Amino acid sequence: MTDTRNGEDSGKLLYCSFCGKSQHEVRKLIAGPSVFICDECVDLCNDIIREEVQEAQAESSAHKLPSPKEISGILDQYVIGQERAKKVLAVAVYNHYKRLNQRDKKGDEVELGKSNILLIGPTGSGKTLLAETLARLLNVPFTIADATTLTEAGYVGEDVENIIQKLLQKCDYDVEKAQMGIVYIDEIDKISRKSDNPSITRDVSGEGVQQALLKLIEGTVASVPPQGGRKHPQQEFLQVDTRNILFICGGAFSGLEKVIQNRSTKGGIGFGAEVRSKEEGKKVGESLREVEPDDLVKFGLIPEFVGRLPVLATLDELDEAALMQILTEPKNALTKQYAKLFEMESVDLEFRSDALKAVARKALERKTGARGLRSILEGVLLDTMYEIPSKKDVSKVVIDESVIEGTSQPLMIYENSEPQAKAAPDA
């Protein structure tokens, strides 16, 4: 096989045997026995082979379903704590995909039902991260929907069918793949009924959305336009069966612990209410573990909706020790991410242990859980990340407690010189 370029070997104009382009239209033309192929066709062939190999690998991994212990072990690498929630999720997801693998077998009279999942936990406790990690582990399409943007059909806002459309977009509109996917609906507590009493005004973003989600979560054939939603009614609709899509709903359910405490506190009114102070001493996570379906109904979810989410997992509030672990231990820990950013500038980044404690304390004060850690670090490192690319002689940056508290600037160590630190700006 020879490389032919610009007609150097002969005066005859040569063409690619596959796409028909001449040797002047391509960068390179490779000659074989009586055939020619251009560099563009070679690239195309490589892409086709790569896609087919990836699909084959995805299929083989889909048949190899990890055990609940293996699923929980992989979740441990990304999510700190929340052991019970991991166990509940691992078993539920394992049973769900085991059910899908068995559904085509003939002669089995027992039909296995779908078990959708409800995650309850304070903000920043890891609900979304758990769902994302599960989808990545199982190599299935995954999408996140925000319940607060959903409205009933016919009103301004997103239809519930838009959730399935987003899932289709994640897998290039492959309906078969989408039907095996995972949908995470966040802020599900925000669509609770505004009141226990019936109202003459229509609650289009609360109970109305719950009613619209019922069939979708339980299993129905949703008609989804390839693009544009309501704006292009003339488009041909795709039919997506949601019976095998796993729905995970998550929410902070602020105030649910009070509903639980009111139920579990027996007797005692007036002078007999001493029991309540004991109950109020419980952490939110401890109270949430005692949640029952009736508590969710009192909170504002309709009974039919609660019934469609039989698997319930509660997450605990993160304490200072857990937040410190989150900063350093997971595969994608924040300190590792920022260290990588600094490494790209050939600078080492070091966090002292007292700095990590200070960051964890600040996040606890803000009550934002793990989600608040990034914003704290971003604020602390902003000036340093602004300056470092312009300084070629910095070899290391050290962050201690005083930097987190704002009383001093990060310590910069320069090559072949003594450590230097800028004075804190005057307040």
Curated annotation (Swiss-Prot):
Binding site for Zn(2+): 16, 19, 38, 41
InterPro entries: AAA+_ATPase, ATP-dep_Clp_protease_ClpX, ATPase_AAA_core, Clp_ATPase_C, Clp_protease_ATP-bd_su_ClpX, ClpX_bact, P-loop_NTPase, Znf_CppX_C4
Coiled coil region boundaries: none
Pfam families linked to this entry: AAA_2, ClpB_D2-small, zf-C4_ClpX
Record bears the keyword Ribonucleoprotein: no
Keyword Zinc among UniProt keywords: yes
An MF annotation (GO) of this entry: protein dimerization activity
Key words of the record: ATP-binding, Chaperone, Metal-binding, Nucleotide-binding, Zinc
One record GO biological process: proteolysis involved in protein catabolic process
CDD domains: RecA-like_ClpX
Domain called ClpX-type ZB: residue spans: 4-57
Binding residues for ATP: 122-129
GO cellular component: HslUV protease complex
PROSITE patterns to which the protein is assigned, alphabetical: CLPX_ZB
Job description of the protein: ATP-dependent specificity component of the Clp protease. It directs the protease to specific substrates. Can perform chaperone functions in the absence of ClpP.
PANTHER family cross-referenced by the UniProt entry: ATP-DEPENDENT CLP PROTEASE ATP-BINDING SUBUNIT CLPX-LIKE, MITOCHONDRIAL, ATP-DEPENDENT CLP PROTEASE ATP-BINDING SUBUNIT CLPX-LIKE, MITOCHONDRIAL-RELATED
Family membership noted in the UniProt record: Belongs to the ClpX chaperone family.
Assembly: Component of the ClpX-ClpP complex. Forms a hexameric ring that, in the presence of ATP, binds to fourteen ClpP subunits assembled into a disk-like structure with a central cavity, resembling the structure of eukaryotic proteasomes.
Name recorded for this polypeptide: ATP-dependent Clp protease ATP-binding subunit ClpX
Native organism taxonomy: Bacteria, Pseudomonadati, Pseudomonadota, Gammaproteobacteria, Pseudomonadales
Gene name, Swiss-Prot/TrEMBL: clpX
